[in-house]
Amino acid sequence: MNGIPMEHGLLLAAILFCIGLCGLLIRRNLLFILMSIEIMMNASALAFVVAGSRWAQADGQIMYILVISLAAAEASIGLALLLLLYRRYHTLNVDTVSEMRG
């Protein structure tokens, strides 16, 4: 058995990326923006793994490890900024914080 076809995996990655992009553009809450970025990064990691498995190369898995480590760094920095934003302004709305700046 070959497993799933490459087109199905790439279609799933594209759908996940579009969901993350819509969440990034529509939502104004910083927590949901961070979650949308994580969805987009996981979609790109899925595309790397699917493409790597199609040609039986380990490059896709190596890129997956890189994307996951970048996602972990982004999540830690993003959550630190989220805590700082909430402690200072008592809101997670990005538009409210940009208006408060003056």
UniProtKB/Swiss-Prot annotation:
Keyword Transport annotated: yes
InterPro entries on file: NADH_UbQ_OxRdtase_chain4L/K (IPR001133), NUOK/Mnh_C1-like (IPR039428)
EC annotation from Swiss-Prot or TrEMBL: 7.1.1.-
GO cellular component, as recorded: NADH dehydrogenase complex; plasma membrane
Reactions catalysed according to its record: a quinone + NADH + 5 H(+)(in) = a quinol + NAD(+) + 4 H(+)(out)
A biological process term (GO) from this entry: ATP synthesis coupled electron transport
Pfam short name (any one): Oxidored_q2
Keyword tags: Cell inner membrane, Cell membrane, Membrane, NAD, Quinone, Translocase, Transmembrane, Transmembrane helix, Transport, Ubiquinone
Record flagged with keyword Transmembrane: yes
Cellular compartments annotated: Cell inner membrane
Record-level Gene Ontology MF annotations: NADH:ubiquinone reductase (non-electrogenic) activity; quinone binding
Topology of this chain in the membrane: Multi-pass membrane protein
Transmembrane segments: 6-26, 30-50, 65-85
Family: Belongs to the complex I subunit 4L family.
Reported function: NDH-1 shuttles electrons from NADH, via FMN and iron-sulfur (Fe-S) centers, to quinones in the respiratory chain. The immediate electron acceptor for the enzyme in this species is believed to be ubiquinone. Couples the redox reaction to proton translocation (for every two electrons transferred, four hydrogen ions are translocated across the cytoplasmic membrane), and thus conserves the redox energy in a proton gradient.
Oligomeric form and interacting partners: NDH-1 is composed of 14 different subunits. Subunits NuoA, H, J, K, L, M, N constitute the membrane sector of the complex.
The name this protein goes by in its record: NADH-quinone oxidoreductase subunit K
Name of the gene encoding the protein in the UniProt record: nuoK
